[in-house]
């Protein structure tokens, strides 16, 4: 039961954040909806990481390249959760 509630809350937050709500609004929802503890910390971390993701780069690497081709005519590289145009990964 508790696991189902967590999954439902998480999916609800993802849906809300994808329809134009900013990260701080979703964080406030987590703060009031989830009791203090490890679960709240985990959900806040997940919301923060999802909020920082640009152009779906971890899920679909080609999207970042398409974005950079459109705006700068350069090759796009996924650096963690951010797209960088013309800056290759330097390991």
UniProtKB/Swiss-Prot annotation:
Cited Pfam families: Scorpion_toxin_alpha-beta (PF14866)
Cellular component annotations (GO), alphabetically ordered: extracellular region
Single annotated GO MF: toxin activity
UniProt signal peptide: 1-19
Main location: secreted
Propeptide feature ranges: 20-27
Localization: Secreted
Tissue specificity as recorded in UniProt: Expressed by the venom gland.
Keyword Oxidoreductase applies: no
Disulfide bridges in this chain: 57-78, 64-83, 68-85
UniProt entry keywords in alphabetical sequence: Disulfide bond, Ion channel impairing toxin, Neurotoxin, Potassium channel impairing toxin, Secreted, Signal, Toxin, Voltage-gated potassium channel impairing toxin
InterPro entries: Long_scorpion_toxin_alpha/beta
Superkingdom to which the source organism belongs: Eukaryota
Domain BetaSPN-type CS-alpha/beta: 54-91
Assembly mode: Monomer (both chains).
Family affiliation: Belongs to the long chain scorpion toxin family. Class 1 subfamily.
Protein name in the entry: Potassium channel toxin AaTXK-beta
Protein source organism: Androctonus australis
Classification lineage: Eukaryota, Metazoa, Ecdysozoa, Arthropoda, Chelicerata
């Amino acid at each position: 039961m508790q696991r189902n509630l967590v999954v439902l809350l998480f999916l609800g937050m993802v849906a809300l954040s994808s329809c134009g709500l900013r990260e701080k609004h979703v964080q406030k929802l987590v703060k009031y909806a989830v009791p203090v503890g490890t679960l709240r910390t985990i959900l806040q971390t997940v919301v923060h990481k999802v909020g920082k993701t640009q152009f779906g780069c971890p899920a679909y690497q080609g999207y970042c390249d398409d974005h950079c081709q459109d705006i700068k005519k350069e090759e796009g590289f996924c650096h963690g959760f951010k797209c960088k145009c013309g800056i290759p990964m330097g390991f």
